[in-house]
Amino acid sequence: MKTPISVKETAYNADQAALDFPPGAEDGYWYLARNNHLYNQLKKNGLDESPILEVGCGSGIVVEFLRKQGLDCKGCDLSDQAAKKSPYLFLSTDANDMEESYRKKVKTLLLLDVIEHIEEPVPFLKKLQTSFPNLEYFVIAVPARKELWSNYDVFFGHFRRYDMKMLRQEMKEIGAKVLVMHYFFKLLYLPGWLTVKLLGKRNLQVGAPQSSFSKALNRIPAAMIRFSDWILPRQWWGSSLLTIVRINKQKG
């Protein structure tokens, strides 16, 4: 029987980190739109007041953004390939191995484009629930729709792209209550689908504008993405899927 790939084996190598987290990626339209969407969801659901840990923080783009908004957010990652040194980032670190005193403080865990890298995500999530005894919420974002599967997913070590049914089932298996679940990046679904169908592959390099002009230009599609996600029905397909779930603690 095939042995499942361990979680530690999913850490990014240098090539993956360079393509997914190039310097300046935080100013690209994709991260601008996702950061805004995430922050709005955290505030809307009252998760912006308590300690937050991003598991699989990569280069720390999300942590830096949320801290600028005044949130108490830190990050950890199994890899140290992409992130700059920061007192708020714990690199080459498994979340389950962080200091117990800190783990007891954390109320919310962010897993943003993380669990698709895990061959068996349910045991992975259950272990986090055990390691963080006062955990109340998971905020999870994943790549969506199997018809968008491409060379990008293969290169970055994805095991799957999700739909709502699949993600709901995993949340059910960990005993969590779904509070929010919806697709986002709806504006990117059709271009992504056409790219896969017509070209058979997509660009692996995440956009990272360098000049002030290109940074300003990236704000335009970011705003268009945010507007389309706001105005279109939640059931409409997007290239990503987000859920917020409450952890049901066992009594006794």
Located regions from the model:
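Residues lining the SAM
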Residues: 112-115, 141
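Conserved N-terminal segment of class I S-adenosyl-L-methionine
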Residues: 1-112, 122-125, 210-218, 222, ...
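Short, glycine-/aromatic-enriched active-site segment of Class I SAM-dependent methyltransferases
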Residues: 22-23, 138-160, 164-170
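C-terminal helical/coil "lid" or tail adjacent to the Rossmann-like core of SAM-dependent
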Residues: 189-222
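A short glycine-rich, Lys/Arg-flanked "PGG" loop and its adjoining helix->strand segment in the class I
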Residues: 122-137
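Di-metal (Zn2+ and/or Mg2+/Mn2+) metal-binding site signature of metallo-dependent hydrolases
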Residues: 117, 121
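Conserved S-adenosyl-L-methionine
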Residues: 176-186
